[in-house]
Curated annotation (Swiss-Prot):
It comes from the Bacteria. It comes from Escherichia coli (strain K12). GO terms for cellular component: ATP-binding cassette (ABC) transporter complex; ATP-binding cassette (ABC) transporter complex, substrate-binding subunit-containing; membrane; plasma membrane. It is a multi-pass membrane protein. Probably part of the binding-protein-dependent transport system YphDEF. Probably responsible for the translocation of the substrate across the membrane. GO terms for biological process: transmembrane transport. PANTHER family: ABC TRANSPORTER PERMEASE PROTEIN YPHD-RELATED, ABC TRANSPORTER PERMEASE PROTEIN YPHD-RELATED-RELATED. The lineage of its organism: Bacteria, Pseudomonadati, Pseudomonadota, Gammaproteobacteria, Enterobacterales. One of its GO terms (molecular function) is transmembrane transporter activity. InterPro entries: ABC_transp_permease. Keywords: Cell inner membrane, Cell membrane, Membrane, Transmembrane, Transmembrane helix, Transport. This is Probable ABC transporter permease protein YphD. Its main location: membrane.
Amino acid sequence: MSASSLPLPQGKSVSLKQFVSRHINEIGLLVVIAILYLVFSLNAPGFISLNNQMNVLRDAATIGIAAWAMTLIIISGEIDVSVGPMVAFVSVCLAFLLQFEVPLAVACLLVLLLGALMGTLAGVLRGVFNVPSFVATLGLWSALRGMGLFMTNALPVPIDENEVLDWLGGQFLGVPVSALIMIVLFALFVFISRKTAFGRSVFAVGGNATAAQLCGINVRRVRILIFTLSGLLAAVTGILLAARLGSGNAGAANGLEFDVIAAVVVGGTALSGGRGSLFGTLLGVLVITLIGNGLVLLGINSFFQQVVRGVIIVVAVLANILLTQRSSKAKR
């Protein structure tokens, strides 16, 4: 199980070799991020500018907020491919509620509840009816995408000017509000994963669900809760996306689920479950965001960008696997 931060443990004498071995994945990702900054700074006009760095933070928030819950889902040995359509559907529902003059606070509360309920539905299908999580969330992906496009005729639903939404889509002390929310939620999920019985149960279920059940862990409840959290954070992302775009859009967040899953896996979380790190996911989010931003500034064809991004992601995952295997051998 990877640690969630890099500082040396207090009260323990740890050699540099042991420290590097323990955090080889995070160190590797930091090196990758440094290389990306160097390459794009030299070749992509405007990449290092303050304005572009704020854009990087905004894009990172769109991926990162959903990635915190996805980390727990993958650690538990599950997967959720419904994130993108859920984010878009929430933004559409929020826009319609505001058009019907529902107060913003009530509208936000309703779409947060909607996101949690949709996540719970996926969790119940997995935890109660034992439907594979990929199948359950793939069905949800199709239903939400189709419903959103049907409700809007594939057109954006405009949102009238609103001071609170403008603030959510803007900056606070020069930093995007969405990025600040991402950081707060990151700290919360680090606490949940490391300091609570629920967090430890997630790792146990991912390591061996049968053994976890025999140890008294309610596997069904754990599975339902992690999908509920995923739906809730997807709703948060949907609200922030609507605030940023000034509209609800069923076509927004297209492919977001793949960026989120890629960020988690690149960050070192094992798809087989039982091992993962939120700090690694944070670095994975930065890697995926920097790649996307840099390729746009380089003027690479949008279709070819997907090819380049896919190759880089596969290489990063392979590097993560090799580094982890090398670390495991070193510990022996």
